[in-house]
Amino acid sequence: MSETCDLCLELPKDDPFYHHKKKLLSCKGLGVKETLNLSGSLSQQLLNAALEKLLQFGRIVNLDKVEVYFGEDACTPAGIYSVRNEISALSWILSLIPVSCKMQTQVDTLEALRAAVKSRISEVVGAEKEKARVVDSYRCEKESRLVEWGQDNGVKTKLQIAQIDGYGRGAIASEDLKFGDVALEIPISSIISEEYVYNSDMYPILEKIDGITSETMVLLWTMREKHNLDSKFKPYFDTLQENFCTGLSFGVNAIMELDGTLLLDEIMQAKELLRDRYDELIPLLSNPVFPPELYTWENYLWACELYYSNSMQIKFPDGKLKTCLIPVAGFLNHSIYPHIVKYGKVCVETSSLKFPVSRPCNKGEQCFLSYGNYSSSHLLTFYGFLPKGDNPYDVIPLDFDVIDDEDIETEFSWTTHMLRGTWLSSNHNIFHYGLPTPLLNYLRKAQGLDHHSETDLWENLEVEMGVLENIQSTFDDMMQNLGDADSIDRENTDWDVKLAMESKERQRKIISSILDSCSAGIKLVQEFIINPPV
């Protein structure tokens, strides 16, 4: 064996965005398969070059749907797509580095690379690093009892539960946590899953209901178990709110405030679906096992909000994905700059669910979990909050018919196009305008411009005008539907109206940025029509 060590990089062929990512890799001068040769001893310069190549490949491989769609238009000069993507890419690189090698020089090289990656993780741009402001007047007695119950039942934690200013209850690091440290570990026996239904007197009745899902079964079990004074999980149920305050509980005034927004449709559709399910289900539960006083619409909605806002999809050792409630873990708040991103699989060796941190979290800082790559409207509807900061997943979808063309470019395979705040784009030059390239190329195609080389675009500036005017007209109508901004005193309004107003203002900000970009783009194109480039 020579004193070399190869790291093999590959874009999986089953990646749902394989062709899009292949194109992005090509733009970086990379193929779908790359081999990185690490010599026995690397200088700092060569080590940095190796890490840069790994990062370029890793970032693209780990792009999600929204990040792929906005692609290079959202990439910073430093090559960063998003904080989420950067953390995922760096974690992916670490997973590629062998734990051991036969040659000492290889070991030294790999250790140097591993240290360089961990250093990058601790320096991720945009990551929140601030001490949590604890509200001392709120005594977390029930929460403390739950943690004690958890520890008595095998839970291991390096987190402290507290009331945090601006967040409600949250989890604070009780010691410095570095990359890979397990902040929280929960044994399977302390997780609420469908297994408890199968071992209850409910199951013989529920299994006879056509089409009932395991998720619905465990939800119905929870509605009754919550009132069981002898329940194993009583300390957990005692910590749950009487009202979850999600978008599903919005009152009439809040719903009226949402007129003209995308969120209004999302909430109304979700509530209608829940009501239909309840009306279909309850007549089938006329049995002493299901006391009517426990299965009211209000209790059903509460249970739905509990599972929407607190449950997690967990993969068990048998390979089955189950919807579970995880005591203690439910106190971890969401952030677009999370510490914990990989936590959905039970460890076979320990029969427990582990929550390792993917970036450092210092003692006294709030430890954040990623609930998923969700829009703010989804988080408000099902979780009851709006995330702090600019959420890159706040997109406005635009549906178009798929263009049927054998020679079509991969951009046109998008069946749903989208726009978001154009301040997130790094390119506002002509032919970009801060708007996503797939959408622009789709609209160019719709106006008869089949080829989109820079020469073609310069020769068809009238098409550019039409594309920008099309987008401008669409979003002018959206802005009109939102109406004028309210002058209501938010400090003295109900919680749901306050959230509705903030959500509407966020949508207004996004639409305003799109209109500004269209106006600036139209002006730019007009200038080049009058004074063509030489």
Annotated model-derived regions:
Residues 2-190, 195-198, 226-534:
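Long, positively charged leader/targeting segments at protein N-termini
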Residues 204-241:
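Conserved, structured regulatory domains from eukaryotic proteins
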